[in-house]
């Protein structure tokens, strides 16, 4: 498979030029509530809306930077819209005084990405747990996913896995449970999500030993397809595989198995969807934590599928686009 390198969320190169201009801005619940007390709720919402507008401008800058550096996939930051899915605050997108302007900026993000041939995806909050036994956790998860999908619609992204929304199953198999039991809970709650979620959702293997490894994810995906005719592609993460290995340790072989779950829109060559995978390395002293850069020798893994078919690799290291640039140079030198 050919290799497409992807950037995740932040551009360290842009931040080196102007940290304030190119950094995403967030807002904590405490900060919002303090503003409400000091200046009133309307003023607090106004400040929040301006921070969100800034985040959309930063995203546009990053997409242009991706184009200039031949990066053809980008994972949108999950922090673009702070607090809007915090149900305790009772905030809605349309409460933002500049929401129509934000609609325009989101459409422009889509235009930039389409013009430059950059695919987009996301990785919603790690606390999204569709298979949870906690009803409130499920409610919050559905709300989070539906919101992400609504933003994808405003951007103008296709309702398929070329614009993946990637999550973890985030459940261990407890005594008396089976993987199939968890799959049924997951599927039942997924069907409560809107069509934009259902058509884009993917899952990835996890880094904790008690949670889903690649084998579990593939079995999970196969069960949903065979039982409900629902396709759930699997994103392979190499660092998570090292921390929480499957029976077969060879990651390239496991990634190949995952790649076949992305052929999901019917029969025929034209229905192949390029898989989106994750590549990272851990710190020697803390293996589950992302290192700054990637050692080129192990990347990209050889996946024995048609060499003309692409695989997208979101590079998950602290140096972000600096690491992508270095990988590009190393790969070019190896040809």
Predicted regions and their residues:
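Alpha/beta catalytic barrel-like cores
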Residues: 1-119, 128-157, 161, 182, ...
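Short, well-ordered beta-to-alpha junction loops that form the rim of enzyme active sites
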Residues: 77-81, 124-125, 170, 205-206
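Histidine-centered catalytic micro-motifs
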Residues: 120-128, 233-243
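A generic structural signal for short coil/turn motifs at secondary-structure boundaries
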Residues: 130-131, 174-177, 243-246
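Eukaryote-skewed repeat-based solenoidal scaffolds used as protein-protein interaction platforms
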Residues: 139, 145-234, 239
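Positively charged, amphipathic and often flexible ligand-engagement surfaces
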Residues: 208, 235, 239-243, 276-282
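Alpha-helix capping/termination and helix-coil
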Residues: 224-228, 242, 258-266
């Amino acid at each position: 498979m050919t290799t497409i390198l992807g950037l995740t969320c932040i551009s360290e190169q842009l931040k080196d030029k102007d940290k304030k201009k190119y950094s995403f801005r967030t807002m904590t619940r405490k900060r919002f509530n303090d503003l409400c007390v000091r200046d009133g709720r309307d003023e607090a919402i106004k400040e929040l809306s301006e921070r969100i507008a800034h985040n959309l401008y930063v995203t546009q800058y990053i997409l242009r930077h991706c184009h200039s550096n031949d990066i053809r996939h980008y994972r949108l930051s999950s922090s673009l819209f702070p607090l809007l899915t915090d149900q305790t605050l009772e905030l809605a997108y349309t409460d933002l005084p500049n929401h129509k302007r934000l609609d325009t900026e989101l459409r422009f993000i889509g235009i930039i990405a389409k013009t430059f041939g950059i695919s987009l995806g996301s990785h919603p909050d790690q606390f999204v747990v569709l298979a949870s036994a906690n009803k409130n956790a499920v409610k919050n998860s559905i709300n989070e996913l539906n919101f992400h999908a609504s933003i994808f619609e405003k951007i103008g992204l296709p309702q398929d896995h070329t614009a993946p929304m990637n999550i973890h199953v985030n459940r261990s198999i407890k005594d008396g449970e089976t993987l199939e039991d968890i799959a049924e809970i997951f599927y039942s709650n997924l069907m409560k999500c809107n069509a934009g979620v259902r058509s884009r959702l993917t899952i990835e293997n996890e880094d904790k030993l008690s949670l889903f490894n690649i084998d579990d994810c593939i079995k999970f995906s196969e069960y949903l397809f065979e039982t409900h005719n629902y396709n759930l592609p699997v994103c392979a993460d190499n660092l998570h595989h090292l921390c929480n290995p499957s029976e077969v340790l060879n990651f390239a072989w496991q990634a190949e198995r995952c790649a076949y779950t992305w052929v999901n829109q019917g029969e025929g060559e034209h229905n192949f969807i390029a898989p989106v995978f994750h590549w990272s390395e851990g710190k020697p002293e803390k293996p589950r934590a992302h290192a700054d850069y990637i050692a080129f020798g192990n990347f990209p893994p050889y996946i024995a599928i048609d060499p003309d078919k692409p695989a997208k690799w979101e590079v998950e290291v602290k140096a972000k686009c600096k690491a992508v640039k270095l990988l590009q140079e190393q790969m070019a030198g190896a040809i």
